Swiss-Prot record:
Compartmental location: Cytoplasm
EC number per UniProt: 3.5.4.19
InterPro entries hit by this protein: PRA-CH, PRib_AMP_CycHydrolase_dom, PRib_AMP_CycHydrolase_sf
Gene it is expressed from: hisI
Official protein name in the record: Phosphoribosyl-AMP cyclohydrolase
GO CC terms, sorted: cytoplasm
Top-level taxonomy: Bacteria, Bacillati, Bacillota, Bacilli, Bacillales
Pfam families: PRA-CH
Amino acid sequence: MNTVDFSKGLVPTIILDDQNGEVLMLAYMNQESYQKTLETGYTWFFSRSRNELWNKGETSGNTQKVKQIWTDCDNDTLLIRVIQTGPACHTGKKSCFFNLIKEDF
């Protein structure tokens, strides 16, 4: 099992829908939120703006049940496949990635 490199404090964490591979969101984990994710089976993140841990869906009910956790080649970025309940984005959209900048290159 790979060890996640938390030497910089936070690691970017990409959340994918386990059913269709859609990118749902990007958040950050520190060692404590990562450990809570492993212990509970649901995503926990570190809020940079509030400087605290948060459990995705704790207040909204839009939870993320973890199916798989992957790390990149440098062990400093995570990719987590989840079963998403409700929308992932705080705007009410399924994914946080809904603003197309350009296509057809």
